[in-house]
Amino acid sequence: HEIEDMKEHPSNLSVEDILIRSSNLGSVILAKKIGEENYKNFIKKTKIIENPEIELEEVGVPHQLNWNKCKLETISFGHGITTTPLQATSLYAAMVNGGKLVLPSIIQDRKIKKSEQIISNETSNELRKILRKVVSSEEGTASLADKDGFHVGGKTGTAESYGDKKNRINTFISIFPANKPNYSLFVMLENPKINKELIYDYRGTKTKAPYNTSGWNSVYVAGKIIEKIG
């Protein structure tokens, strides 16, 4: 299977551009530069493939990760790995809170275990800016979540269902306000359909959804939720 992008991008994308434009090919290049061992070590540090720790009887458990041929490449853009929405949200929170991974809880004012520093504070600051541009810039994939007064940042994901490549899982993880995040919101739509009657206000233009991707459904839903809770 050939790895490709949905649309053609410039060949000289920076790391920031790769994230903003959601380039699969760019992600593969970055992963190869990082190297498989470094990638493995970082994934282990994030705990996204471990059993979730939370005060619930029943929790989703990620599928075992087997490092076979091309696994590094497919993991780099999210197709070669499974995790739970809870763990993904926790990881994104760590990415923007100064780099500290805090285990989630459903208990208010629970005594928090010692958090683990998984990225530097400087890297976290840069990621906040990039995630904001995913929503606010012309090249970004999540402009439908750009709601006045909320300063939303985030990252889109359009993936194949595990074991069924015909079905899609479209996700959007948002953080807001992006300059000093207080909230993280995860929206996941399994095998969504395009609403042919829905007219979007897309960057000042009225249009229908041209693609069945997270930028046109999960992002739209997240924007509506953020407006409601705001």
Locations of regions flagged by a protein language model:
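Beta-lactam-recognizing serine transpeptidase/beta-lactamase-like catalytic domain environment
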Residues: H1-Y200, S214, S218
